[in-house]
Amino acid sequence: MKGIADLHIHSRYSRATSKQGTPEYLNLWARKKGISIVGTGDFTHPEWRKELEEKLVPAEDGFYCLKEDSVLEESREYEGEAPRFVLSGEISSIYKKNGKVRKVHNVILLPGLEDAEKLSKKLETIGNIHSDGRPILGLDSHDLLEIMLEICPDGILIPAHIWTPHFSLFGAFSGFDTMEECFEDLTPYIHAVETGLSSDPPMNWRFSALDRFQLISNSDAHSPAKLGREANLLDIEMSYQGLYKAIQEGEGLEGTIEFFPEEGKYHFDGHRKCHLCLTPKEAEAYGGICPVCGKKITIGVDHRVMQLSDREDGEARKNKKPYENLVPLPEVIAASTGKSSGSKRVQEQYENMLKKLGSEFDILRKIPVEEIRKEEGYLVSEGIRRLRTGQVKKSPGFDGEYGTISLFDPEEIENPNGQMSFFNEWEREKEPGIQAVDSCISGGLTQKKTEELSGLSVEDREESVAEKQKETIQQLNEKQKQAAETIARRIAVAAGPGTGKTKTLISRILYLLEERKVSPGEITAVTFTNQAAKELKERLEKQLGSRRSVNRMHIGTFHSLCLDF
């Protein structure tokens, strides 16, 4: 049977997840997406296992489906066979090995609820499995694999998102350099690895040590709507053994559906707090130290792959599987309409498309563009055509900030940006006081255009900040321009009256707003007099076309700012 499998997800019992992470909604969204096999996620959590036992019934060997009386009425509106569930869960192992603290995530698949119960009981003697659907255990990955094999020889352990900097097998901060260093004598029992959102198959093909492993992809979804953002293409016997052969031996594993790796939040190097994104070579030139604040740069997936790879490209790998880069359909609709992907209009159009044309994956991958155009018009169909042919613009993610993918140029649609942001705000885990970073320094800054910049909507101004900033920068001499655009930790401007110091300062602020995407609330400008502060505010208001952003900045004398704080 040909189908799509997403095996690594999380229920509502994991931290930072949707309340809709229930069997009912997983079933609903798997139908919408066109997914045949869904991992249950979080099998170690007692309450989740209890819920699974109550709401699932056995289907094919090792697979389950939702009980008929648990199926949401809405689910019946979508065609296709009921999706199957397979027992899955993720374990976070934090332990010391070879003189270094290791933090590794592993996904486990099991053939049934009884095996999940036995393994969970054993893990409960080692650590707390009640507080989080993805338990954190002080358990060596080698020992976790050994315990699993003793309790359930047919279990499958897959190192999860193997390149993620902080919690993975090859992570730059707390991982290993080789599979053998992690799993030792049990390495032969590892047959597959999960590439993760920030890497794709070609990046992994560059590391010959991975040639003997199957490369699989999953969504790691924290809400049902995120199912399938990465997934596996299968042609297998519909059973756990069929799935086992695909993952362990590659028999029936026909390829993967991938995120654009640039969109992953750890693709490039950088420092989110300083709004700094760097290529691996640029990060090395800075010695791994942020030139703005002097702290360590977060090493991204692309850099870590470069460190361990032994090939210039992956063409030498013999058993390569096909892969497809996709983005969710609501984001294509949003990009073509100029609306937010979460807007009512986009959601209504999304639902209508599913009911008229078929599942989301069929629309994105199979249905002829002409048929889509006939039903939905030019822009949506053109967006899908470009997606299928790889005609996208990419702005890479870094240090925990997701990258962005663009399908349209500004002049192609009514919306002035045509850019997509693929994650709802609640799903972006931001530290207090740290704003989303959307620019990237890469031999010159890559500009991201946004519909709303720093609280100032497009309609509120006649000219964009980008145009004003460009115009202002062009009026500076070389030394003034250097001061305005530097990424150095500090810059001193020594000049007499009438030499353009205020103009340079204004240019610096505009540069931070537009090129570095710094929030106005993070900008402080100190003046010697109240009159100078007033003049600075007035000139900024003139440049920005509104007071809103200026009022969010901290502009004043030293004493007035101290009083405000």
Please state what every model-predicted region is.
Residues 9-22:
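Active-site mouth loops of central-metabolism enzymes
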Residues 12-14, 40-49, 94, 115, ...:
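Active-site environment of divalent metal-dependent phosphoester hydrolases
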Residues 29-48, 156-158:
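Divalent metal-dependent hydrolysis catalytic cores, especially in the metallo-beta-lactamase
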